[in-house]
Amino acid sequence: MNLITFNIDDKLLNKRSYSIVSKKKNLLFHFGCQHNKSFEKINKYRVAKVYELNKKGNLPNKLKYLEKSYNELLKNLYKKLNKAHNKNYDQNYWEILIGKWLKTFVHQTYSNWEILKKIENKYNIKSFSKISLSDNFFIPENTWHAHQLIRSSQHKYNLFHHWLISKMLENKKKIKINHLSLKNNLSIESELLKLSKPNKYQNIFYKSLDNKIFYYLWDVPRKIKIEIMKYFKFLNIRLNTKTIREYHPKYFDRDLIFYNEYQPNNFQSFLKNIIKFTFPKIFLENFNTLERMYKKLNWPRKPKYILTSYPYYEELFKLYCAQNYFSGSKIIITQHGMCNIFQYDDALGPASINKTFFHAQLSWGKNRKKGLKKFLFTKKYTTKVNKFKFKKNKKILLILYSLSEMEDRLPNGYSDNNSINKIIYNSTIKYLKQVEKSLLKKNDIKILQNNRYPMLKNSIKKKYRNIKFMGLEKSFDKVIFQYNLSVHFFIGTPFFESIYLNQPTILIFDSKIYSSFDKKFLRFIKKFIDNKICFTNAAEAAEFINNNYTNLEHWWKSPKRQKILNEFCEMFCGKSKNLHEDFKSITKI
C-alpha cells in the first residue's frame, strides 16, 4: 500500500507524477483529500482511520512525554540562542519569546509522529509518495507564519505536513520512497510566503504616576479597561498600529547552531534534527531588528504588572515582556477560561504555555484547576441581570462548529475532526427533522467554520435549502438578543456567553465529541440534563422545544433553574459583584 500525505484533490502534481500516484493502491493521511462536498456522499478514497476515543489509558503518559519533550527542546534552544546572540538570559526569558511557537511545533509534530506510528502498525505500508521540496521552504518568518504553516489547512499550497512526514520516513528502509514533482508553473516557496504577515506593534499613549499597571492586547470589554484606569489612576490608550518595515538580517549558520547527532526512531532527536528548518527567523536572523525597535518604544519601563491576553503574534511585545520580566515586572494573563473544564490540558490552548514565567493566569470563574486564579468572565461585561422576555417575532439560533481537516490532537483518547463534524451534522439533521414545521422556519444557523471546505453547511443546505446561515461576520454576543433561544451543538465560547447573559440556552451533548471533562464540569452537565438545559439526544431536544417554545420565559426563569445557572456562572464564567475588589485581587496575587 502506498501512503499519501498531501491533498490529492488539489492536483498539484505534473502529469507524469499524477499518473504514477493514480495507478497505485493508495492510503491517504487524514487531510489527504477533500472529504467530499457532502457527508451523504461516500468517499472514493481510502483514508487511514487511527483515532480511537476509547483508548484513553495511556493519554496522561503521552501528554507528560509531550511536556517533557517541550521542556527538553526549550532547554536545548535557550542555550543555543544565548550563544548565537552573545547573551546570558535565563530559560524563562527565551520561553516568553519562543514558547507558544515551540509548544505548537512540538505538539503538532508529536501528533503526526503518533498518527504515522499507528498507520504503520495497522496498515501494510510498502511505499510513500514524496513531493520534491526544498527543506528551506518551511523556515517561517515569525510565530504567525509558523502557526499558519503548522496548523492552517485553508491554503491549497501548504505542504508543511507532507514535508514533515517525509522527514520522518527518510530513514525507514522498509518503505520505498516514490519521488514526485509539482507542476512546472508552481512556485511553492512564494505561495508559502503568502501565509506570513508583517510584524506589527501598537503605538500607545501612556500616563501614570507610578507605572503600576500596563495593559496590551488585553482581551476584556472596554468598560473594564475604563474602570481599571480610573481605579489605578493611569491612561493606557491605543493610538494606532505600526508595521516593522526595516530589517537588517544577520547571517547565522543554521547547520552549525542546530547541529544534532540523529538517533533513529527517537522523537526528541527528530525534533532537534529538523529545528534548523522550522525555527522562525525573527528569533535568529532578524532578532537584532527586534532589539533595535525595542529601544525606540514609548511603552512604560518596568511596570509592576503587565496585563495581556493573546500576545503570541506580536514579537516586539513579547520581547518587551521578556525584558521587563527580567527587571521584575509581573506578567498576568487573562485568557480563554474554557481551559479548566477538561480533565487534561489542551496542549495548544491558552493554558498551554509553561506557567513558570507568568505571575498568574486568571480564570473565567472560581474553578482554579491547573493553577488558574479566580477572576471574572472577560468576553462580556454587564452589571445588570438580563430579564428575558419571549417575543413572537424572534427566532431560534443553532450554533454549530466545523473543525479543521488538519488534526492537531493525539490519535488515542480523542475523536478525529472529520468524525466530530459528522456527529454535529447528524445531530443537527436529527433535530431539524423532529422540529415542527411551524417552528422549522424560525431556526437560523450560525457556523463557526475552521475548515477549508464548507462541508457541514453544504450538507445541511442540501436537505434544508431555506434555512438562513451566518458565519463569522458577526460575533455571537452581537446577535444573541435577536433570538429567543440558542441551541448549541458544541461546547464553545458562545455556550458560556449565552449562560453568562442569562439567555435561554440548550446544549446538545454528545460525549464522543470530547475527551475527558473535569469532574466539577461534569456535575453541572448532569444538573443541566436533569433540568432540560442539556440533552444527549437531538430529537428529544427538538421535541422539548416543540412543547415548550411559547413557554420559554417561564421555563428559563424558574428559581431552581436560575439557581443552577448562577452556580455554573460563579464556577466557569463569573460575574463581577464589585470591579474594584476584582482589581484589588490582581495586586494581591
Model feature map: region roles:
Residues 1-589:
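Catalytic-core helical/loop segments in enzymes performing group transfer/polymerization on anionic/lipid-linked
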